[in-house]
């Protein structure tokens, strides 16, 4: 038996899906529509698998495309009662302090509520170091308009956070210091914002500094826009002059209002509302992931189209071919400083979604039937790598809670779920892993977090990730900006010259006698540079860097001139042994400290390593030929985790435990011979 279906056209008609339940994806009963059409049109004949009890009538008609005006209208729908902005800046230009003032003036807190400084830096590590590491969401309401604010990291090593955040917003507040002007990270974040086509409001912060030069800063920022190929509309940016700590802003540096009103007005006026498809199929890109012990993984992102409701069944897509189904158990929006439960979220708003197991950054939460994935987030490649391995020192297992390679592997894989800019690969042995990141600070923050969580492990020295293109070896280069007093400029210039740095700009700043030096330098030359540059400038220089590009191999670079003092045997250090050892260099350990053979206990005052016995005791006899001499020991050097990672060389390791940080020689390399 055959099923007949009449058509009004000799050419294959495009079947509407709603025409009949038998029609699906240009097929009828599983047979291709085009292949069943006989030449000359008329009837379609499909073989039936079994006799039909009664005739079935199907209709087919050509689909008509939507008018161009309707498509255009969909694209131009804007939501005027919402603004999504990110605050971006170079490190220490005052953006987190500015957010504090914005939250206070928007009445986010009670008048009698006591709040700490830098409210958005809630992480312990952020508060200790005075930097923003993770992006944070909050919102304020100004004149019936909800303003979603995202505070972003200012350090170039956490650029991956900035790149993710820019997917959620429609505009940025570019905060620039009134003295320093645009810095390396300013260039990086502005470049990304312009690539997204975002509107930019420039905030010249710290305008109350005595040496402020607002006109120079605005002109320099405009030149930066031109260099980054900004459009005419983007170059016509609004400049706001502000003092974040005082909570004042204005359109002129000489005429500041008593509050941040001019800044809020500029946000509403210059940043457009989100571009949405309110009636379209649901689409939301998971831009950030948080974890809650009770709710599990929480996906954060902006709703691009449709309406998301609590209890809704959705499709979670990684790509066109990889999708799974889930149900939204809880839904939150950001109001003031908190997450607030809600039953539904409209397109254009930023929300947090619970109930989707194993949701990953870059996945799309879409409509169950018509959903399609959004473009995934692209993040720049890592430039530095370090080896992580199980602790093999004689003191292993004494202080840590998680010490096995399985513990280490699971923790590193868990980090990859949130940290898009990081990569983890297997090393040469089963208990070694290679972790790649955007810089040494990027990886050091991970090490510090793991240490505080109870992990015990060893890390090797940072190494740059080179590329080979057309049989040419390329290495990463960075732009380094050094702020140094003129009196110490000579040693700093000499040091950067030894590190293969090439100066391309030098500027003097006002009456403070400070000089800005700009260099293009290999990333290898920056390893261990921070301590060296502080020593050369007597603690007065400020170094900032940002990745520039890959370039030709610059040749050999010597990063450390002095060797190490290495413990000769296991034991406990004594004052008697340290008194003679300190004549050989500066010590890392004091009296009464347990040490092991191969541990680095000091800095040798000459090139090459020197083995010392700092555990020997004074022989006791019954004869007193002379009186006892009082031993005076120098104060040992205290090295932080960052300092230790900068100090070690190819054949050395840092032992990291929850309560101690030690350096030692790599015994595996010692057996092979120093390479």
UniProtKB/Swiss-Prot annotation:
Cellular localization per UniProt: Plastid, Chloroplast
Family: Belongs to the TRAFAC class translation factor GTPase superfamily. Classic translation factor GTPase family. BipA subfamily.
Taxonomy of the source species: Eukaryota, Viridiplantae, Streptophyta, Embryophyta, Tracheophyta
Region Disordered, annotated ranges: 43-76
Any one of the GO CC terms: chloroplast
Transit peptide: 1-58
Pfam families: BipA_C, EFG_C, GTP_EFTU, GTP_EFTU_D2
The keyword Protein biosynthesis appears for this protein: yes
A single GO molecular function term of this UniProt record: GTP binding
Protein known as: Putative elongation factor TypA-like SVR3, chloroplastic
Biased composition annotated in UniProt, kind: Low complexity: 59-68
InterPro entries given in the database record: BipA (IPR006298), BipA_C (IPR048876), BipA_GTP-bd_dom (IPR047041), BipA_II (IPR047042), BipA_III (IPR047043), BipA_V (IPR035651), EFG_III/V (IPR035647), EFG_V-like (IPR000640)
Coiled coil: none
GO biological process: protein stabilization; response to cold; rRNA processing
Organism field: Arabidopsis thaliana
Domain tr-type G: 80-275
Consequence of gene disruption: Reduced plant growth, pale-green leaves with reduced levels of chlorophyll. Chilling-sensitive phenotype.
Function, in words: Putative chloroplastic elongation factor involved in response to chilling stress. Required for proper chloroplast rRNA processing and/or translation at low temperature. Involved in plastid protein homeostasis.
Annotated keywords: Chloroplast, Elongation factor, Plastid, Protein biosynthesis, Stress response, Transit peptide
Location, primary (coarse class): plastid
Gene3D superfamilies xrefs: 3.30.70.240, bipa protein, Elongation Factor G (Translational Gtpase), domain 3, P-loop containing nucleotide triphosphate hydrolases, Translation factors
């Amino acid at each position: 038996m055959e099923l007949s279906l009449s058509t009004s056209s000799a050419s294959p008609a495009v079947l509407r899906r709603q025409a009949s339940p038998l029609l699906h994806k240009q097929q009828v009963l599983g047979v291709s529509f085009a292949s069943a059409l006989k030449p000359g049109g008329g009837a379609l004949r499909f073989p039936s698998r079994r006799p039909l009890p009664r005739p079935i009538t199907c209709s087919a008609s050509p689909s008509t495309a939507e008018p161009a005006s309707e498509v255009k209208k969909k694209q131009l729908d804007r939501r005027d009662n919402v603004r999504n902005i990110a605050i971006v800046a170079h490190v220490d230009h005052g953006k987190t302090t500015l957010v504090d003032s914005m939250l206070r003036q928007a009445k986010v807190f009670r008048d009698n509520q006591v709040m700490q400084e830098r409210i958005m830096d809630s992480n312990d590590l952020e508060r200790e170091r005075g930097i923003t590491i993770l992006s944070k969401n909050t919102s304020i309401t100004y004149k019936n308009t909800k303003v979603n604010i995202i505070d972003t990291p200012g350090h170039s090593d956490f650029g991956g956070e900035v790149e993710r955040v820019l997917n959620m917003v429609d505009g940025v507040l570019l905060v620039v210091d009134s003295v320093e002007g645009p810095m390396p990270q300013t260039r990086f974040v502005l470049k990304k914002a312009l690539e997204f086509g975002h509107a930019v409001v420039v905030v010249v912060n710290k305008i109350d500094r005595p040496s402020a030069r607002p006109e120079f800063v605005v002109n320099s920022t405009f030149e930066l826009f031109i260099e980054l190929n900004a459009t005419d509309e983007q170059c016509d940016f609004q400049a706001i002059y502000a003092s974040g700590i005082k909570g004042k802003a204005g359109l002129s540096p000489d005429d500041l209002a008593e509050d941040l009103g001019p800044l809020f007005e500029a946000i509403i006026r210059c940043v457009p509302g989100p571009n949405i498809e309110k009636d379209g199929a649901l689409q939301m890109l998971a831009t950030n992931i948080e974890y809650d012990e009770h709710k599990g993984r929480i996906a954060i992102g902006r709703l691009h189209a449709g309406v998301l409701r609590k209890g809704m069944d959705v499709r979670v897509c990684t790509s066109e071919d990889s999708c799974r189904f889930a149900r939204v158990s809880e839904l939150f929006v950001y109001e003031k400083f908190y997450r607030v439960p809600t039953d539904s979220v409209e397109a254009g708003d930023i929300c947090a979604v619970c109930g989707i197991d194993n949701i990953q950054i870059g996945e799309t939460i879409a409509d169950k039937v018509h959903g399609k994935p959004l473009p995934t987030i692209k993040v720049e490649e890592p430039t530095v790598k370090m080896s992580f391995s199980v602790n093999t020192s004689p003191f292993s297992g004494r202080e840590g809670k998680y010490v096995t390679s399985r513990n280490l592997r699971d923790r590193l894989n868990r980090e990859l779920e949130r940290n898009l800019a990081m990569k983890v690969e297997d090393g040469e042995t089963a208990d070694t892993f290679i972790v790649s990141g955007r810089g040494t600070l990027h990886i050091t923050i991970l090490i510090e977090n793991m240490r505080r969580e109870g992990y015990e492990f060893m890390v090797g020295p940072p190494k740059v990730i080179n590329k080979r293109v057309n049989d040419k070896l390329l290495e990463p280069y960075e732009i380094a900006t050094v702020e140094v007093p003129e009196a110490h400029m000579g040693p700093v210039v000499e040091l950067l010259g030894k590190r293969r740095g090439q100066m391309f700009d030098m500027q003097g700043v006002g009456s403070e006698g400070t000089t800005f030096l700009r260099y293009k330098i290999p990333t290898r030359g920056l390893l261990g540079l921070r301590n060296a540059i502080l020593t050369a400038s007597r603690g007065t220089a400020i170094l900032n860097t940002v990745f520039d590009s890959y370039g030709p191999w610059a040749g050999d670079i010597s990063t450390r001139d002095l060797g190490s003092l290495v413990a000769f045997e296991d034991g406990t250090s004594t004052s008697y042994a340290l008194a003679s050892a300190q004549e050989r260099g500066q010590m890392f350990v004091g009296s009464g400290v347990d040490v092991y053979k191969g541990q680095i206990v000091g800095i040798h005052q000459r090139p090459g390593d020197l083995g010392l016995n700092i555990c020997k005791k004074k022989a006791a006899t019954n004869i007193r030929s002379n009186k006892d001499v009082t031993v005076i020991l120098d104060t040992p050097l205290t090295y932080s985790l960052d300092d230790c990672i900068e100090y070690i060389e190819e054949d050395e390791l840092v032992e990291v435990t929850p309560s101690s940080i030690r350096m030692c020689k790599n015994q595996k390399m010692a057996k092979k011979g120093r390479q």
